């Protein structure tokens, strides 16, 4: 089936996810029907345990639906092999988490370039892209600094630079401001939106931060694994 300009980036049809629990199966997501368009900025909100992070993991090919269909453009993500999922993540997805997971013994630019080098990219190319990404997040003056000398907000910005290094089509962020103070979190949240607009990448954010959610173009609210509400400002 050919992709057309109107094809959604993501299409979920009756998507559910369950895990084996003690003595019974634990249902986390219950039959989600949803589309996400290329270039959107989307917040996923809801109480703890509502399925937000599970949904993000499905969108990032970190997990597979138990039932239903999940398509990226016209590709069935549920039918991907583990190798295909890994290639898909490397090519299409950038991940940002609450904790930056930067390696303290390396410089900022080394941390940002490292995964590309491990994947086989020549050092010069990887470092060039890393410097460009760090410039995008306002860290051009901190390139050679050890990450231990960076503030919390700067470390999260370095993690964002790492996520956008290869210009993925989608940026998935799980509580990206959850470990930051209010002012720093606002700076990081607005930076994510700036990158969404400037680079044209789809931004999907799981957050408990109401102010951050309200900045997004659309807010999806999950309750007990179901899509309870969709809201556009």
Curated annotation (Swiss-Prot):
It holds the Pfam family ABC_tran. SUPFAM superfamilies: P-loop containing nucleoside triphosphate hydrolases. GO terms for biological process: lipoprotein localization to outer membrane; protein localization to outer membrane. Residues 10-233 form the ABC transporter domain. It is an enzyme of class 7 (translocase). ATP binds at residues 46-53. The keyword Translocase applies. Its EC number is 7.6.2.-. CDD domains: ABC_MJ0796_LolCDE_FtsE (cd03255). It is found in: Cell inner membrane. InterPro entries: AAA+_ATPase (IPR003593), ABC_transporter-like_ATP-bd (IPR003439), ABC_transporter-like_CS (IPR017871), ABC_transpr_LolD-like (IPR015854), MacB-like_ATP-bd (IPR017911), P-loop_NTPase (IPR027417). One of its GO terms (cellular component) is plasma membrane. Its main location: membrane. GO terms for molecular function: ATP binding; ATP hydrolysis activity; transmembrane transporter activity. Keywords: ATP-binding, Cell inner membrane, Cell membrane, Membrane, Nucleotide-binding, Translocase, Transport. The keyword Translocase applies. Part of the ABC transporter complex LolCDE involved in the translocation of mature outer membrane-directed lipoproteins, from the inner membrane to the periplasmic chaperone, LolA. Responsible for the formation of the LolA-lipoprotein complex in an ATP-dependent manner. Belongs to the ABC transporter superfamily. Lipoprotein translocase (TC 3.A.1.125) family. PANTHER family: IMPORT ATP-BINDING PROTEIN, LIPOPROTEIN-RELEASING SYSTEM ATP-BINDING PROTEIN LOLD. The complex is composed of two ATP-binding proteins (LolD) and two transmembrane proteins (LolC and LolE). This is Lipoprotein-releasing system ATP-binding protein LolD. It comes from Nitratidesulfovibrio vulgaris (strain ATCC 29579 / DSM 644 / CCUG 34227 / NCIMB 8303 / VKM B-1760 / Hildenborough) (Desulfovibrio vulgaris). The gene is lolD.
């Amino acid at each position: 089936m050919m992709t057309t300009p109107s094809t959604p980036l993501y299409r979920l049809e009756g998507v559910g996810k369950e895990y084996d629990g003690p003595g019974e199966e634990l249902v986390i997501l219950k039959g989600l029907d949803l589309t996400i368009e290329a270039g959107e900025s989307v917040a996923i909100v809801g109480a703890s345990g509502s399925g937000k992070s599970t949904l993000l993991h499905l969108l990032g090919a970190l997990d597979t639906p138990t039932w239903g269909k999940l398509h990226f453009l016209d590709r069935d993500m549920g039918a991907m092999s583990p190798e295909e999922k890994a290639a898909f993540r490397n090519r299409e997805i950038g991940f940002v988490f609450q904790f930056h997971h930067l390696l303290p013994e390396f410089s900022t630019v080394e941390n940002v370039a490292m995964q590309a080098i491990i994947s086989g990219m020549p050092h010069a190319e990887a470092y060039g892209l890393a410097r460009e990404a760090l410039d995008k997040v306002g860290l051009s003056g901190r390139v050679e600094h050890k990450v231990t000398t960076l503030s919390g907000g700067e470390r999260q910005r370095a993690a964002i630079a790492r996520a956008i290094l290869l210009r993925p089509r989608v940026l998935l962020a799980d509580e990206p401001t959850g470990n930051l103070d209010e002012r720093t979190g606002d700076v990081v949240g607005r930076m994510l939106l700036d990158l969404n607009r400037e680079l044209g990448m789809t931004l999907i954010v799981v957050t408990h931060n109401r102010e951050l959610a309200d900045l997004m173009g659309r807010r999806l609210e999950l309750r007990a694994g179901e899509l309870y509400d969709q809201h556009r400002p």
